[in-house]
């Protein structure tokens, strides 16, 4: 408990690769796929070139 008083958790830098950051990347990929007309809104997956977006149908 003394460690928490000396070193609060707010001073510890968080890792940038947290799962909370991944949806933003995924949304960017979906947006690109929608522009290329490869995103299936009904099935919520990518049809066509799967290296452009994920998940792939």
Curated annotation (Swiss-Prot):
Pfam families, per the entry: Conotoxin
Domain of life: Eukaryota
InterPro entries: Conotoxin
Annotated signal peptide: 1-16
Tissue expression as described in the entry: Expressed by the venom duct.
A GO CC term attached to the entry: extracellular region
Subcellular location: Secreted
Disulphide-bridged cysteine pairs: 45-57, 46-53, 50-56
Propeptide residue intervals: 17-44
Keywords attached to this entry: Disulfide bond, Secreted, Signal, Toxin
UniProt GO molecular function: ion channel inhibitor activity; toxin activity
Domain note: The cysteine framework is III (CC-C-C-CC).
Similarity section: Belongs to the conotoxin M superfamily.
Protein name, as recorded: Conotoxin reg3.17
